[in-house]
Amino acid sequence: MIELKHVTKRYGAVEALHDVSFRAPEGQIVGLLGQNGAGKSTTLNILTGYLPPTSGQVLVDGMDLLQNARECKRLIGYLPEKPPLYDEMTVRAYLRFVCELKEVQKSAIAAHVEDIIRTCGLSEVAHRLIGHLSKGYRQRVGVAQSLCGNPKVLVLDEPTVGLDPRQVVEIRALIADLGKTHTVIFSSHLLSEIQQLCQRVLILNRGHLEYEADMQELAETGETLRLRASIAMREKQLIPALRSLPCVRRVKALPTRTIEISEVLLECDASAVPDAQTQLFRLLCGLDAPIRMLVEEHDSLETVFLRATDEGAKNPVADSFK
């Protein structure tokens, strides 16, 4: 639906983006994750045509954004980091104004605005001046203006920043609902937000796209497999036996309520799966040590983010074995 191809952006001698390429398919919520200054806002400004790239190409529904700016921008709704609101206008009047700017057919504006007001939960404040609204409602109005003209793609720049916990939950629910009928790209520096809402994640670091994957791929891939097991055998006998397995890199004993049951965390070579589990079962059968629980764990988004943004950062997974 919308795609960046080898996009670079320079401000004089400063390179804000370097050779960034990615695609947001139709009907997906895509999260752009990165620290402050990573290049998230620059990326979104280029995606929406507010900034031209120094080099590279932006395609919207197969059309080049620079060559077909008018047609492409009709397909994009944009919520910048600071919503473009007019405090002296009422919510309803403002949305009518935005519809006129986007050249919505005049006979359809009234019904279109009321539909947006309902979708964004603004019915109770539609008659009020925007300047008198709370931060949460102002953000809802910002999302609402991005829906004017019924664009196929919504681009939201840190839509929950500065909101209180209840407002954050409400805006996230709204984004999830919009994702059912739109392609949504939104930026955030909150890991939990990306995990909760997105089908796909992109990690930017210092202007470079360091990581790109579906959330399902993230759950299923990784160099390391971790197994958490509860085994009916004393720790002193069990740990040396587990360490003898070729596929096991590290073993850590976890606290238990009884010495007859051992709780362990195993770090195994992911390339050995499913052989790792087979080796474990054979070993424990030979030791007459029943397995009470076996849970497979994968790399978290936090682990991937730390690895992508700082090669020298401590690995929280590795730390768990200390």
What residue spans do the PLM features occupy?
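ABC transporter nucleotide-binding domains
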Residues: 2-4, 9-205, 209-211
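C-terminal coupling/interaction segments
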Residues: 269-322
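Positions that flank functional sites
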Residues: 114, 132, 257-258, 299
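ABC transporter nucleotide-binding domain
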Residues: 172-267
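Hydrophobic/anchoring residues in structured secondary elements
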Residues: 34, 250-253, 296
